[in-house]
C-alpha cells in the first residue's frame, strides 16, 4: 500500500509518499515540496503544481492520495489560495485515477500522535519516529504532508481489516 500525502499551497505544496513496510511499520519513499515563484501568474502557478503532481503520481503510482480538508482561518486570501491548490490536487488525482481521502487536521494529529490536539513539534517528532528518519523532515510543508500520508495509510489499513468498509 502506497499513499501520497499532500499539504496544499500555491507557493509551496508539501508532498510525502509513504508505504507499508510490513509488520505494522511504515517507510518514507520520497518527500519534499513543489514550489512556484511568487512573481508567476496565478494560472501558471496552478499549472506548474498540476504538472508536478501528475509527475509524482506517474512515477510512484500511489494507491490513494490523502489531503487535509480546508481549514478556514482568519486570512480569507490564504484560504482562497489553499482552496485553489486543493482543486489542483483533486483534479490531478482524478486524472490519474487515484482515489482521494480527506482528513481534518485533528484526524491527522490523532492518527500520528494519538492526540488530536498535538502541536506541530509533537507531530513532526512522531513523523520522524514512525518513519525511522534520521531527522525531522524539512521544510515543515513536507513534514505535514508525511503526517497526512501516514493518516491515509492508517485509514487504509483499518479499512482493509474491516473488509473494505469505508
UniProtKB/Swiss-Prot annotation:
Gene from which this protein is expressed: ruvC
Family: Belongs to the RuvC family.
Locations listed in the record: Cytoplasm
Record note on cofactor: Binds 2 Mg(2+) ion per subunit.
Protein name: Crossover junction endodeoxyribonuclease RuvC
Assigned EC number: 3.1.21.10
InterPro entries: RNaseH-like_sf, RNaseH_sf, X-over_junc_endoDNase_Mg_BS, X-over_junc_endoDNase_RuvC
Key words, A-Z: Cytoplasm, DNA damage, DNA recombination, DNA repair, DNA-binding, Endonuclease, Hydrolase, Magnesium, Metal-binding, Nuclease
Residues that, per the record, bind Mg(2+) 2: 68
One GO molecular-function entry: DNA binding
Catalytic activity from the UniProt record: Endonucleolytic cleavage at a junction such as a reciprocal single-stranded crossover between two homologous DNA duplexes (Holliday junction)
GO biological process terms on file: DNA recombination; DNA repair
Required co-factors: Mg(2+)
PANTHER family hit by this protein: CROSSOVER JUNCTION ENDODEOXYRIBONUCLEASE RUVC
Active-site positions on this chain: 7, 68, 141
Subunit structure and binding partners: Homodimer which binds Holliday junction (HJ) DNA. The HJ becomes 2-fold symmetrical on binding to RuvC with unstacked arms; it has a different conformation from HJ DNA in complex with RuvA. In the full resolvosome a probable DNA-RuvA(4)-RuvB(12)-RuvC(2) complex forms which resolves the HJ.
Binding site for Mg(2+) 1: 7, 141
Keyword Secreted applies: no
A single Gene Ontology CC term: Holliday junction resolvase complex
Annotated function: The RuvA-RuvB-RuvC complex processes Holliday junction (HJ) DNA during genetic recombination and DNA repair. Endonuclease that resolves HJ intermediates. Cleaves cruciform DNA by making single-stranded nicks across the HJ at symmetrical positions within the homologous arms, yielding a 5'-phosphate and a 3'-hydroxyl group; requires a central core of homology in the junction. The consensus cleavage sequence is 5'-(A/T)TT(C/G)-3'. Cleavage occurs on the 3'-side of the TT dinucleotide at the point of strand exchange.
Species name: Symbiobacterium thermophilum (strain DSM 24528 / JCM 14929 / IAM 14863 / T)
Main location: cytoplasm
Keyword match DNA repair: yes
Amino acid at each position: 500500500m502506497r499513499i501520497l500525502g499532500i499539504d496544499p499551497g500555491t507557493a509551496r505544496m508539501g508532498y510525502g509518499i509513504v508505504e507499508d513496510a510490513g509488520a505494522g511499520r511504515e517507510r518514507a519513499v520520497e518527500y519534499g515540496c513543489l514550489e512556484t515563484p511568487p512573481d508567476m501568474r496565478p494560472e501558471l502557478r496552478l499549472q506548474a503544481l498540476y504538472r508536478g503532481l501528475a509527475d509524482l503520481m506517474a512515477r510512484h503510482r500511489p494507491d490513494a492520495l490523502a489531503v487535509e480538508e480546508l481549514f478556514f482561518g482568519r486570512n480569507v486570501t490564504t484560504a482562497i489560495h489553499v482552496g485553489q491548490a486543493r482543486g489542483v490536487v483533486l483534479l490531478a488525482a482524478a486524472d490519474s485515477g487515484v482515489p482521494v481521502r480527506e482528513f481534518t487536521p485533528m484526524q491527522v494529529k490523532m492518527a500520528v500522535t494519538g492526540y488530536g490536539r498535538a502541536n506541530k513539534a509533537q507531530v513532526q517528532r512522531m513523523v520522524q519516529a514512525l518513519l525511522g528518519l534520521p531527522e525531522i523532515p524539512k521544510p515543515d510543508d513536507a513534514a505535514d504532508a508525511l503526517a497526512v500520508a501516514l493518516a491515509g495509510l492508517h485509514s487504509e489499513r483499518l479499512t482493509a481489516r474491516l473488509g473494505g468498509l469505508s
